[in-house]
């Protein structure tokens, strides 16, 4: 279904990046919605800790919030930056950014399906799929 629609076959270990929802926020697509897609690609739900305060900013509390929001009921979950140090990828010819820090667990995957959204924060930054 999804692989036919995209025209791409996701191979090997597949990471599925979602926005799992902040505490008290209902503005995220529920795990039940993503369940058939994740099953089709045999994926693992992946997330990263946030750079701003809240339950998603620490490895100790982030998994608990994902459980509260129902993610662990349906999926294996990998918090990609739960163990450090980050992997540093160079950005050749980058105008502003010269390198990108990514969670170490990203190296455990062969493919990634990004189901997270992109957004501009009122704090003057960007978030969602971009982080």
Predicted features by range, described:
Residues 1-131:
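N-terminal and secondary-structure boundary signal
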């Amino acid at each position: 279904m999804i692989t036919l629609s995209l025209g791409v076959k996701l191979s090997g270990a597949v990471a599925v990046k979602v926005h799992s929802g902040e505490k008290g926020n209902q503005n995220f697509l529920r795990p039940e919605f993503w369940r058939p897609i994740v099953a089709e690609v045999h994926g693992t739900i992946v997330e990263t800790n946030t750079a701003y305060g809240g339950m998603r900013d620490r490895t100790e509390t982030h998994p608990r919030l994902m459980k509260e929001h129902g993610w662990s009921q349906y999926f294996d979950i990998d918090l990609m930056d739960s163990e450090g140090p980050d992997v540093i990828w160079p950005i050749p010819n980058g105008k502003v950014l010269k390198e990108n820090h990514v969670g170490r667990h990203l190296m455990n995957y062969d493919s990634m399906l990004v189901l997270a959204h992109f957004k501009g924060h009122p704090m003057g930054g960007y978030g969602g799929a971009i982080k």
